[in-house]
From Swiss-Prot:
EC code(s) of this entry: 1.8.1.2
Domain Flavodoxin-like: 64-202
Quaternary context: Alpha(8)-beta(8). The alpha component is a flavoprotein, the beta component is a hemoprotein.
Named cofactor requirement(s): FAD; FMN
Gene name, Swiss-Prot/TrEMBL: cysJ
Domain of life where this protein originates: Bacteria
Pathway assigned in UniProt: Sulfur metabolism; hydrogen sulfide biosynthesis; hydrogen sulfide from sulfite (NADPH route): step 1/1
FAD-binding FR-type domain ranges (all copies): 234-448
Binding residues for NADP(+): S519, R520, K525, I526, Y527, V528, Q529, D561
Positions with a binding annotation for FMN: 70-75, 117-120, 153-162
Protein name: Sulfite reductase [NADPH] flavoprotein alpha-component
Amino acid sequence: MTTPAPLTGLLPLNPEQLARLQAATTDLTPEQLAWVSGYFWGVLNPRSGAVAVTPVPERKMPRVTLISASQTGNARRVAEALRDDLLAANLNVTLVNAGDYKFKQIASEKLLVIVTSTQGEGEPPEEAVALHKFLFSKKAPKLENTAFAVFSLGDTSYEFFCQSGKDFDSKLAELGGERLLDRVDADVEYQAAASEWRARVVDVLKSRAPVAAPSQSVATGAVNDIHTSPYTKDAPLIATLSVNQKITGRNSEKDVRHIEIDLGDSGLRYQPGDALGVWYQNDPALVKELVELLWLKGDEPVTVDGKTLPLAEALEWHFELTVNTANIVENYATLTRSESLLPLVGDKAQLQHYAATTPIVDMVRFSPAQLDAQALIDLLRPLTPRLYSIASAQAEVESEVHITVGVVRYDIEGRARAGGASSFLADRVEEEGEVRVFIEHNDNFRLPANPETPVIMIGPGTGIAPFRSFMQQRAAEGVEGKNWLFFGNPHFTEDFLYQVEWQRYVKEGVLSRIDLAWSRDQKEKIYVQDKLREQGAELWRWINDGAHIYVCGDARRMAADVEKALLEVIAEFGGMDLESADEYLSELRVERRYQRDVY
């Protein structure tokens, strides 16, 4: 459970002032913070004449530096809960987002705790990429005086489960750090593991660190600490789906929907760059198929989080059915003694491949068995919400939120299958129907504070979504900064998402440049990374003029290919080798001039 962030209306500072104050005090020791506090007290309470001050005996209190490296918000919530636990224990703690951490100070850390998620092919979350690169570079310092602990969040449906946490843990040890605790790797259902780990961290730190006076306990963080809303992941807003429009052509191989959701008078606020969390209901037809394959009826009572529910209801609302994992396959094979699946158990690569290509219902179809209802429930993972990059700005749409949804559809031996959340939004929620949503704030994907700063946006496919939000915001504010969009998809006539809007922005001068890559409209495939290389000289001029670069879309292939192209452009037109170009791009990332929202 996290402690609610302070209501901005009750703070004497505005968000920008609060952010500057936090940035200015991040690196201060407790003694320095105490001095600054006394200094400001003296400014507010001037006295005439000399005042004798009795010095307070200096007390050395090792500070616990707590780094949150989050992609979807889960790692941040765990870190915030640990911060609250440490403060309650009167321990001196500084909480900082990985993107705000000045990693060159890591050599001076005495007590370091990292809570991290993993994205893509085992990569660190975006806000931790620079720190990760630094630790794995030749510049990384020895850490013989640092004691550390790592909590890693992941998803066993991915091959490189918790790889980011494994990387940080092994590298900190390799650099000479002392493990306070063994690393914990947590799956999607991480809450219980996180709660136990937090208690252990508090215990071990209390045994090592002198207790700080409560008045000297300090917690700092990024600007997202000031976000507050009565609607959260665990208490979502029941909103109304008002528009469901297919925005790909009749002959397109893709089914992409423009979804508009009415937030009513909820007061729910978001910024360009944020994501919308959507809770969904599994397809009742899929539930019926799975239940019948296991020779069950659906009305069998099962226990879910201490409550008794009918099996069908539990499957529809509480468990993941459309994403299989290696753990589920292994457990099902062991439980049923399946002759076809047991040989996979000893082969990690084959097991992972099978899970990635065979939905749960088809695993049961191909390897039938009879399970009781509770055994089935115990086999599955809890349902989790899906996050979609927001494609609108409230400066234009007010009490609405828009998202761009690529509907997942495929066949398994002639049987139609679909993604859980995307098909729920596209096929099963009627217009004016209810949908449970919340805002996942993303302060690592924000427009420049200076409206005159040029912006380069790279977003193929549904990665276009946040840039629609960006342009709505910049158009509404009438900003003068230049905007350049790189977009790509298979076909111009079928897959040009929001075509009329982009053309209008070009005509109005809001969008300064647009480069389009259609991969299937000619013999040679052309992608956005090819357009980046083609426009390399002009791209470098924009970067030299202070442009911010944004990338959104597929993490597995596109993001890596785009980064490679950017490095080549920087090396060629910046007159440097690839290693120097990589350092240059890392500096842009640290300066928040290179931001990615990849998934």
